[in-house]
């Protein structure tokens, strides 16, 4: 039994479907927002929107008790909170780290679709890059 079956067994089917619909849309929009963090004219809007995306993922996955997702989303949300205090675009290491984070969340979406166990978080994602 995979993650989708676990959720369907413990929560109303409509709640699970709504989560997956919204989660899928957030995953689809992440990459372009991350890349836009390196553009001066797009930085503020992108960092604020990414913060909102990870906050929403953290909240929804917390409600559904998807612990690895909640923990990683919280970790990224904290990093984005630091980035929100800045005015200049981020460096390449930060963009690459966030793209790797996005890949992890996309892998989890595939795990949901295929009703597999959630893929383990890559250790490298838990090492925050230099945000300067």
Predicted regions mapped to residue ranges:
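N-terminal assembly/transducer modules of large multi-domain enzymes
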Residues: 2-132
């Amino acid at each position: 039994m995979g993650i989708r079956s676990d959720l369907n067994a413990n929560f109303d089917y409509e709640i699970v479907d709504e989560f997956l619909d919204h989660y899928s849309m957030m995953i689809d929009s992440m990459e372009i927002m991350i890349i836009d963090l390196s553009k001066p004219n797009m930085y503020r809007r992108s960092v604020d929107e990414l913060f909102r995306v990870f906050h929403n993922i953290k909240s929804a996955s917390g409600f559904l008790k998807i612990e690895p997702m909640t923990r990683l989303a919280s970790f990224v949300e904290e990093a984005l909170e630091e980035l929100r205090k800045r005015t200049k675009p981020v460096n390449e290491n930060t963009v690459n780290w966030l793209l790797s984070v996005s890949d992890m969340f996309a892998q989890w979406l595939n795990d949901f679709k295929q009703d597999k166990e959630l893929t383990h978080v890559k250790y490298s994602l838990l090492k925050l890059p230099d945000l300067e």
